[in-house]
Amino acid sequence: MTSRRTRLVMAAVLALLSVASPRALATEAPVGQMSWALHFSLAPTLFEPAEAAGLITPFMIIYALHDALVKPMPEKAMAPGLAESWSRSPDGLVYEFVLRKGARFHNGEPVTADDVKFSFERYRGISAQVLKERVAAVETPDPGRVRFRLKQPWPDFMAFYGTPATGAAWIVPRKYVEKVGEDGFKKAPVGAGPYKFASFTPGIELVLDAFDGYWRKTPSVKRLVFKAVPDATTRLAMLKRGEVDIAYAVNGELGEEVRRTPGLSLRPTPFVATHWLLFADQWDPSSPWSDRRVRLAANHAVDRQAMNQAVTLGYSKITGSIIPTSFDFYWQPPLHAYDPIKARQLLAEAGYPKGFDAGDFWCDASACQYAEPVLNDLQAVGIKTRLRPLERAGFLKAYQEKRLKNIVYGLSGIFGNAATRMEPFVVSSGAFAYGGYPDIDGLFKEQAGELDPKKRSALLHRIQQLIHEKAMVLPIWQLALLQGVGPRVAESGLGLIADYPWSAPYEDLKLKPR
């Protein structure tokens, strides 16, 4: 009898557990600490979704501190976040989001429609101009609903708003921001993500603590520590000593060393980051770069496959495009073969038989490891240039303000589609565009209003063909980062979100039991 009663009680308990929400089941308190060695310097701009700058790097921190209405998650590319659901009107002019009940910021305030409207209107990052030119109004009929009313149907609204193509859908608390001001928010950010701000030492270390009020689940790991370690050898040494659990960007020979080291594992993370060279002076008639033959010569000078093997152990893709291969409306261009003889011939035809001084070669300091082999190949055919690394914040500021000349090492790893990737870099009005071409600008404007998918695809393919024909840029590769993972990690989060290079979602990370 006792045995039968016990079985009935257990069955009842299991039945209750089977219908309980994930949030209700997450009763265990967070424990332990997970640490990362990062390949770039830490700056307060990383806490600020309103300043997302066309790179995937800031989302490493944004995914922890903040939450979006819609965002990429393990189950899908556009998963419900602070919005439980969303819909589009039949005429394509209105997008309505229903907010998640019970979602709160770290200071206890509820996430409301007013916060969503405020976050959009305050957004000033990548593609802000495009969004605000096309949105007629943001309406808040009640605290739990938001409507975006467009000036005309725009097929890319969710590509720009519902993915990390921009930071516009990541929500900050209006009352708190207005109380502390913009500088105060960067000093002590408050978000609605799974982790809350604990401390920050500029350029050195960021510490975040688990937020037990996060709507999706309580994180398993109590504390996250991000350490800025620009030197790759030092990052690997820290991983081997157990000072960090994950070391980002341990490339080339260091990646091989991770493979050989007992207890460590190498995790390649292919993602949507494409790298290229911008010939910033191609619109200056007095510059050698204004001659298409010179730009073609540079394209034939670079041995991309050798670079891929040496730096990323062959995990990157040579695509010939600034558009990731997985993006909607991607067009595969013919690849420029590595041919230094042809490169020299093209330079001679353009009037530079002995090459020329190409001036400065600008790069984000964290990307210089990729820029150096490109520079060496250019030098080998007579294109003489000098590497000029800048700390990331300074590089992005100078890049956007159009203060960089000659050659710029460009890159982007944000989500979206072919249109969202091209808009900041190829269209003449783009945030990082140093010039443009009327035919490309005209086609881009035309595709933005085209609702027929086949016609739109043809327009976007034609733009990509023109970029290739003009040799407007020097595409390098679609990067795969090599990440080192230490022995304490049960779930690193690497690869959980498709095409995303960092650990995420942070609330899913786990340490091994002691």
Mark where each language-model region is.
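Surface-exposed binding/hinge segments that line
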Residues: 23, 29, 130-176
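Aromatic- and charge-enriched surface segment that lines or borders ligand/interaction sites
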Residues: 29, 84-127, 141-147, 235-238, ...
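Detector for C-terminal structural segments
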Residues: 31, 38, 201, 267-270, ...
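N-terminal lobe/hinge region of extracytoplasmic solute-binding protein
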Residues: 37-90, 121, 190-191
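A structural "hinge/loop" feature
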Residues: 40-59, 82-83, 109, 157-167, ...
